């Protein structure tokens, strides 16, 4: 091997001396240049072997698209929490909804508020607003990304029973999914290609902190594969009234239909007649500390190929540890009416904590501790960059 490397070294030196006359002035650097070139060849061959092993995925197995800014998503999450708990029929709910719509508009999205009255489990009439923000609404080829934006009115899973009737701030269970969608909307406006209509605001939500987590994980921009402009539309839907499901302290029988009320309404009454999309991705609790996203059972049942697509994308961008190839449990969530009624294959990116005694959804689920102190930029980054990979790979 040493002899072969020396032969290669000699050939490279000879080639450089013959072809690059200016190199004569820097001949003392040639051995270093040659060794560097050989090292790059060896590294390249390792990369080729890895690509060959992945077969058909080799062509797409490179990070594409812009870097997701976790600091910006974190600030979007915090901004929602600053309104207080966004419980149904509250002023905080109305004010935050208006802010979300204006923020999407500022990133050039076409925004459609879908307002309706929905009946809660206890007969309470809920003033609900599904918020639909569309990138390039003129295109018929579309992808749906969704999350719920309301807060749980009761911390009924809190370890302290005295908190069970207090509202949840919902930093993770509500705000985190919307925050990721807002940052995606900002990046679509800036990098998506054909511009969206509306006001223009390409600034990140928060630039006061140091560089984004992505800078330490992803390849530098000049080493990443450039992506062509998107040729499809994207719809961001903020579903309302997801978390008004029957509380644990209430004995009223429930079959699961008291949850995801806004998604149920939209699926039966889409904002566009005959609306369809290639697929949908639901983001639920995507900012928690220590989160891992197992493959949810209903997602595997209705949209296994989309699960495979998203989990592969997480590996490509270096976040496979957040998306283990393990099966979780089945969840009653907004993706069910999207699958069953709207007939759009939709998956649920939702955490699974198999060893957490408080809840398999994590220690802060439906407790007063679901606040910004328990939001992790790394989790936001993992989910956001994975979605960038999915969108820019289409």
Spans of model-derived segments:
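C-terminal motif of bacterial Sec signal peptides marking the signal peptidase cleavage site
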Residues: 44-45
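Solvent-exposed loop/turn segments at secondary-structure junctions
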Residues: 87-88, 117-120, 137-139, 149-153, ...
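Catalytic-core environment of secreted peptidases
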Residues: 70-76, 83, 107, 129-189, ...
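N-terminal capping segment at the start of a domain
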Residues: 51-96, 107, 357, 361-374
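Second-shell loop/turn segments in exported
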Residues: 62-67, 82-91, 118-121, 163-174, ...
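Acidic/histidine-rich catalytic neighborhood of metal-dependent amide-processing enzymes
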Residues: 165-207, 215-219, 227-305
């Amino acid at each position: 091997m040493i002899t072969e490397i020396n032969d290669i070294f000699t050939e490279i030196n000879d080639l450089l001396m013959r072809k690059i006359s200016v190199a004569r002035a820097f001949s003392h650097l040639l051995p270093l240049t040659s060794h560097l070139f050989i090292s790059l060849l060896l590294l390249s061959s390792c990369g080729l072997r890895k690509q060959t092993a992945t077969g058909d995925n080799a062509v797409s197995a490179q990070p594409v698209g812009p870097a997701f800014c976790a600091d910006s998503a974190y600030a979007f999450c915090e901004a929602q929490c600053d309104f207080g708990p966004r419980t149904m029929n509250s002023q905080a709910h109305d004010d935050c909804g208006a802010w979300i719509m204006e923020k999407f508009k500022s990133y050039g999205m076409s925004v459609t508020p879908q307002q309706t009255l929905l009946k809660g489990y206890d007969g309470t009439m809920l003033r609900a607003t599904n918020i639909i923000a569309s990138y390039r609404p003129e295109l018929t080829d579309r992808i749906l990304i969704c999350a719920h934006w309301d807060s749980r009115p009761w911390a009924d899973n809190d370890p302290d029973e005295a908190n069970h009737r207090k509202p949840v701030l919902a930093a993770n269970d509500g705000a985190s999914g919307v925050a990721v969608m807002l940052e995606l909307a900002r990046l679509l406006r800036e990098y998506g290609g054909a511009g969206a209509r509306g006001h223009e605001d390409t600034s990140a939500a928060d630039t006061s902190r140091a560089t984004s987590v992505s800078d330490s994980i992803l390849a530098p921009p000049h080493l990443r594969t450039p992506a062509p402009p998107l040729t499809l539309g994207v719809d961001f839907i903020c579903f309302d009234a997801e978390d008004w499901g029957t509380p644990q302290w209430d004995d009223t029988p429930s079959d699961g239909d008291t949850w995801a009320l806004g998604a149920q309404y939209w699926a039966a009454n889409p904002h566009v007649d005959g609306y369809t999309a290639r697929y949908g991705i639901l983001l639920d609790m995507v900012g928690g500390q220590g989160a891992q996203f197992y493959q949810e059972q209903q997602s595997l049942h209705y949209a296994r190929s989309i699960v495979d697509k998203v989990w592969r994308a997480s590996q490509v961008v270096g976040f496979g540890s957040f998306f283990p190839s393990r099966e979780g449990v089945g969840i009653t969530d907004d993706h069910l009416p999207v699958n069953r009624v709207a007939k759009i294959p939709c998956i649920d990116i939702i955490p699974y904590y198999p060893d957490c005694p408080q809840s398999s959804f994590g220690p802060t689920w439906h407790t007063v501790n679901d606040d910004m102190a328990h939001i992790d930029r790394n989790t936001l980054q993992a989910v956001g960059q994975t979605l960038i990979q999915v969108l820019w790979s289409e």
